[in-house]
């Protein structure tokens, strides 16, 4: 009996979780390069939103500027239908990038850095007071990086009724192209590609479509999917992945109220971002944060050209 117990592997020993990778790195087991590669794929850009500021109007953070998209035949850019347009006229992501850069109201994107294990479906595995250290303001310098940011926000805001296998095939081709342009000089692009890889595969899994890479489906989401579809599961287990009110205790200065407008859909991948206290933290961070993380240089050591 004792031999049988000792032969049973611990779940961390056969998983790709962050804990398992750290254990392998410390023990010296496994291929070190492969471990480092997988560790570098754990952080993601989440709650990606465009930012616009106009005097006299609340700062707008939106994840739904793109109503619909498809991949161009050349697979090097996206064709977008922007939200609020009266017709379904398409615009290429390159042209939209040029328009945004020329618009003084456009302030780039903001996002939150989460690891795969901190993304807990309908809640966040980080204490609310620490979240302000996880937000980043980013202004893409190239059209492809801009398109990758748009794609992140688009995937985050999709729901199960908008599942489209043919679109996922297109997006996989677009991501393959984006990955082919990643170099040591383009660490931010790699980071954005990693995020899109996680989100695309997870969205496919939640939509009951076989993902392109099952090793990069966010772990909490697949567990939650199985728990939700299983009869007789303890409510306590389900509650681990549901929204909590921890953030209500985080006191945001009253002066920030009404200074921001956050617009996101109730998508399959952004259930954790619907809470009012999180919006207050973002607004306070944007208007009153000191030493805010801004740009690629705050995340990576970059090479000087």
Swiss-Prot record:
Q: Which UniProt keywords apply?
A: Host cytoplasm, Host Golgi apparatus, Virion, Virion tegument
UniProt subcellular location: Virion; Virion tegument; Host cytoplasm; Host Golgi apparatus
Organism encoding this protein: Gallid herpesvirus 2 (strain Chicken/Md5/ATCC VR-987) (GaHV-2)
Output this protein's name: Cytoplasmic envelopment protein 1
What is this protein for, i.e. what is its function? Plays a critical role in cytoplasmic virus egress. Participates in the final step of tegumentation and envelope acquisition within the host cytoplasm.
Q: Name one Pfam family in it.
A: Herpes_UL7
Q: Write down the HAMAP family for this protein, in alphabetical order.
A: HSV_CEP1 (MF_04038)
At the top level of its lineage, which domain of life is listed? Viruses
């Amino acid at each position: 009996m004792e031999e049988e117990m000792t032969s049973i592997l611990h779940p961390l020993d056969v998983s790709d979780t962050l804990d398992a990778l750290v254990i392998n790195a410390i023990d010296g087991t496994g291929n070190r390069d492969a471990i480092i590669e997988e560790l570098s794929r754990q952080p993601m850009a989440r709650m990606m939103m465009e930012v616009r500021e106009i005097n006299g109007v609340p700062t707008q953070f939106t994840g739904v500027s793109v109503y619909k998209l498809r991949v161009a035949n050349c697979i090097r850019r996206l064709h977008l239908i922007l939200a609020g347009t009266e017709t379904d006229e398409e615009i290429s992501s390159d042209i939209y990038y040029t328009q945004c850069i020329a618009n003084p109201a456009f302030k780039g994107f903001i996002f939150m850095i989460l690891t795969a294990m901190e993304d807990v479906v309908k809640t966040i595995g980080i204490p609310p007071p620490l979240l302000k250290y996880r937000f980043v303001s980013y202004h893409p310098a190239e059209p492809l990086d801009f398109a990758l940011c748009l794609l992140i926000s688009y995937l985050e805001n999709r729901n199960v009724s908008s599942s489209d296998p043919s679109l996922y095939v297109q997006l996989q081709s677009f991501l393959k192209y984006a990955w082919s342009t990643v170099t040591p000089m383009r660490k931010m692009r790699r980071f954005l590609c990693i995020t899109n890889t996680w989100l695309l595969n997870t969205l496919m899994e939640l939509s009951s479509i076989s993902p392109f890479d099952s090793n990069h489906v966010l772990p909490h989401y697949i567990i939650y999917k199985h728990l939700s579809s299983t009869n007789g599961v303890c409510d306590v287990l389900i509650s681990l992945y549901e929204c909590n009110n921890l953030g209500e205790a985080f006191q945001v200065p009253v002066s920030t109220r009404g200074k921001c407008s956050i617009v996101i859909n109730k998508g399959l991948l952004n259930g954790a971002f619907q809470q009012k206290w999180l919006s207050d933290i973002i607004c306070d961070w944007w208007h009153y944060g000191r030493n805010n993380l801004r740009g690629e240089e705050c995340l990576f050591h970059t090479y000087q050209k």
